[in-house]
Amino acid sequence: MAREQDFAPGVGDIEIYANTDRQGIWLAWQDNVPLGCIAAVNYNPSYAFIGLFVVKPKHRGQGIGRRLWQHALKNLSSVECIGLEAAVQMVGFYEKAGFQKYCVTTRRQMLCRSDQSQHPNTTLLQRSDITVVPLREISLEAIQRYDERHEISPRPHFLELWLRHRAGDVFVARDSQGACHGYVRIRPCLLPIGEGWRVGPWLAEDPVMG
């Protein structure tokens, strides 16, 4: 469903969400046919994130999306802070539910020719004493410490599953002491037609590092 609606889900994303929160994925079914879905994933007791909220076009306007939404919020009722990314046409809906705009997310896309490499460029760059290395050359704990300083809330369980998933690659800006100064994950994604790549999370201390 998400692929059909141009969400471009990453390969393995649902698996990671489900393993982060066993009660975090909800679907609406009728006669063994999925009509809609929503992800409402607890990262920890104080923070959760909602995404993959979609209902098939021919089933919209029947209250399915609202029931999925209410079910997700009920499941997250004890969480202190809930985040989400809103499609432009859904901003009003979320504001009525009590959500406030925090920042604007810009989606950027690059189309590749069919004769180009099917795998992203993994050339490692160097700057000063900092080297860009693959995940295996730095400790997971170093990345988690960096992530905690730059994200709204700690998410060690989710982050471990996210970084170690077999789909895609992770690259880290590491200094000579083994500390993390930024990281990025690139993974294959499912486009409405064919496949592509998604980049994220992408955290860095400055534009040059990024």
Model-identified regions with their sequence ranges:
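N-terminal non-globular leader segments, chiefly Sec-dependent signal peptides
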Residues: 1, 7, 31, 43, ...
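Active-site rim helix/loop that mediates acceptor-substrate recognition in acyltransferases
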Residues: 1-39, 149-171
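Core nucleotidyl-transferase/polymerase catalytic module
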Residues: 26, 88-89
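Conserved beta-strand in the GNAT
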Residues: 27, 32-41, 48-54, 172, ...
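Short alpha-helical
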Residues: 45, 89-92, 138, 154
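Conserved GNAT acetyl-CoA-binding A-motif
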Residues: 50, 69, 75-87
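Conserved acetyl-CoA-binding loop-helix of GNAT-fold acetyltransferases
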Residues: 52-55, 61-74, 92-96, 206-210
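Amide-forming acyltransferase catalytic core, primarily the GNAT-like/NAT-type
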Residues: 99-201
